[in-house]
Each structure stands twice: as C-alpha cells, then as structure tokens.
Amino acid sequence: MFLYVVCSLAVCFRGLLSLSLQSSPNLCPGVISTPYTLTCPSNTSLPTSWYCNDTRLLRVTQGTLTVDTLICNFSCVGQSGHRYSLWITWYAQPVLQTFCGQPSNTVTCGQHVTLYCSTSGNNVTVWHLPNGQNETVSQTKYYNFTLMNQTEGCYACSNGLSSRLSNRLCFSARCANITPETHTVSVSSTTGFRTFATAPTLFVMKEVKSTYLYIQEHLLVFMTLVALIGTMCGILGTIIFAHCQKQRDSNKTVPQQLQDYYSLHDLCTEDYTQPVDWY
C-alpha cells in the first residue's frame, strides 16, 4: 500500500522527479565574433546555474548569459531542477536568428515567431523557401509571423553584399484550418520592432486533447487518493471503537460484568422458553 501511495504522489507531483532532466537542445544560430545572449527557457527570475560542457560557471547566476564565439555546449538549470541544453552554431554573416528559447524544432501551430537577420549590410531580404521557391517576405532585418500551414517551411536571408544566403531555419506545422493574419511591422536598427496587428486566440486540437488527458489523469489519481484516505479512516475508526469498547469493559466492576452476562444469557434463551401451543 505504501508503494501505491508513493507511485500516486509521483504521478501528481512529477516535477519532484525531474531534477537535472535533459531537454532536447535548443539550437541557437550565432554570428562569428559577435556577442550572443542566451536566455534560459526556465521562465524564472530566480538564480540560474549555467554550465559549459558540464562545467559550472560559478560567477553566473542570472537568467541570461552573453557569449562571444566560445566553443561550448551550454546548459542551464533553474530552481525547478529542469535542465535545458542551448547549443550555439556559429556562422559568417548573414545569419538568420530566432529567440534561442524558441528554436524552430519546438514551435507549435499558432505560436508567434520572430526572425532577425544579423548582418552589417543594409540591403536585407528575408526569404520564404516553400517547395524550393524563393518568396520575399520582408526587406528589413526583422520578420514576424504566426506558424500555420501557410507559413511553415524554411526561411533564409541575404544582405545584398553577396549572392550567398544565410543559414536556413525550418518550421513544421500540422494545423487545423486557420486563416493567416496580416502583420504590420515597424522596424528600426536601434529600437527593434513593434507589431500593430493583434493575433486572435488559436486553438489547436492536439493541444486541447493533450490538456484534456492531463486533467483526466490527475482527476483519476485524486479520486483514487480520496478513496484510499476514506478506507484508511474507516479502518482507524474501527480500531478506535474497539479500543474504547475494551477500555469501557475493563472499567466495570465484577457485579456489573455478572449482570451484563446474565442479561445477555436471558436474551439469548428467551425465545426457547416460550410455551408451545399444540393444536
């Protein structure tokens, strides 16, 4: 029974068992000889531990880490104990980047994606490459879109200084029928961008189903724990009642015990001493 309780608690509080659990690496495209800021995806302002090839960086406790062409496989651990891997791949300009905490292999249908073309050139073009075709989607360093069937595929950028395209960032989505939204983006090389269009709430059937199963699983465990606690309370009540009954009997005097005995004897023999009518 103890093992059953431990297993039930492990299901309910699975976060307790996720210490130092490795997640899939977040691939972060970086520009050679250019500082790159890594952000730990733990979403917490509490102290964070950073590691370089499993060697802890003792002086770094913030949620961000700025590096400059350092050959390391970085990882971070938040207060929850979950471990995230952040791998940087360095490229020569131009380099198409996205938030390191939101790599292309983790973006799901309906999420916003921000692309940034890191280059010293000013004649920047961001390309969408569906089915091998080159489609211009932005002529600024920033491009903001929502991942859906119409926007999935690979993206790259160019800087006008050479014919070479940047690295490719590819996104895959299997969405329900969702109408793409139009973004109006204002870009500045110093202030970044602002999005004026607001996105409607998007519901993905897969995510809804997953949430339903998650709630159903925890509800089943909760009901099982309630039934287990009720059973244990019933057993405990029976033990307490028996103990009290025994204690009360032990406090009775000998005459009282004899009186109870003869009263019980008369009750048991009363039905057998009644006269019988013969017809």
UniProtKB/Swiss-Prot annotation:
Keyword Membrane belongs to the record: yes
UniProt cross-references to Pfam families, sorted A to Z: K1 (PF02960), KSHV_K1 (PF11049)
Entry keywords, A to Z: Host membrane, Host-virus interaction, Membrane, Modulation of host cell apoptosis by virus, Signal, Transmembrane, Transmembrane helix
Leader sequence segment: 1-18
Domain of life, source organism: Viruses
GO biological process assignments: symbiont-mediated perturbation of host apoptosis
Parts of the chain on the Cytoplasmic side: 242-279
Cellular localization per UniProt: Host membrane
Extracellular side: 19-220
Entry's transmembrane regions: 221-241
InterPro entries from the UniProt entry: HHSV-8_K1_cytoplasmic_dom, K1_C
Its membrane topology: Single-pass type I membrane protein
This protein's GO CC annotations: host cell membrane; membrane
Subunit structure: Homooligomer.
Function noted in UniProt: Promotes host cell survival pathways and may contribute to pathogenesis by preventing infected cells from undergoing apoptosis. Acts in host B-cells by mimicking the activated B-cell receptor complex. The cytoplasmic tail of K1 can induce the phosphorylation of a number of different kinases, leading to the activation of survival signaling pathways.
UniProt protein name: Protein K1
Record lineage: Viruses, Duplodnaviria, Heunggongvirae, Peploviricota, Herviviricetes
